[in-house]
């Protein structure tokens, strides 16, 4: 037996939201564009409607109104298209995407773009912790601060934050690049395998095996290109940090040395 809450969201007998797997068919479609008003829709209904109009209707430009900080919006879209959120999604927005170009005119919660493969997500505000967790490709651009553990387990792609970043940014980073224009809290690049982190402000402390690097012409070209693409103005003076290649090269260490490093 299902129950209806005051907000209009339906729950099944186990308390799991939205047992109905059918899209609501409420989007306003006009040629190659569509608008979804998410005010009275559950997360599942919003995502079902988004996938319907992108895959079944072939719409390439979608605007989602009133996302209401609902979690897990815009996930699993595996097609090139343009998606605009007018308002703020909650946690886990735009995870597991491969191709979309997403514009978020608001702020966003934890784990933005988790396991993103390609495309871009631009946020006109801050983002929470775990931004770009396990990012594999594409660009995440946050016009503001990002929280703790940004780019944890990052495997590719680029994360740009015009503000500051929290603790353990770049933790266990494997590949890819980050550009943090402001300050970074303790543990930058802790246990990173590879990749590069550029920082414009002060670093509270470096994590294990994260060391300063030397900027070169390729770094400058890359940074200038990304700032030009996303109209971010002139880049600040940035410092480069990279992996010292000690922690994870165990074959080159004696057992006693491993204990010291760890």
Where is each model-derived feature located?
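A structural signal for beta-strand register positions
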Residues: 120, 139-141, 158-160, 177-179, ...
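Feature marks extracellular polysaccharide-active and adherence modules
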Residues: 65-67, 76, 84-88, 95-96, ...
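Glycine- and acidic-residue-rich phosphate-binding/metal-coordinating active-site segment common to enzymes
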Residues: 148, 154-167
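Intrinsically disordered, low-complexity terminal regions
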Residues: 1-66, 72-73, 167, 174-181, ...
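Beta-strand repeat architectures
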Residues: 51-61, 72-81, 92-100, 111-118, ...
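Active-site-adjacent structural elements in folded domains
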Residues: 127
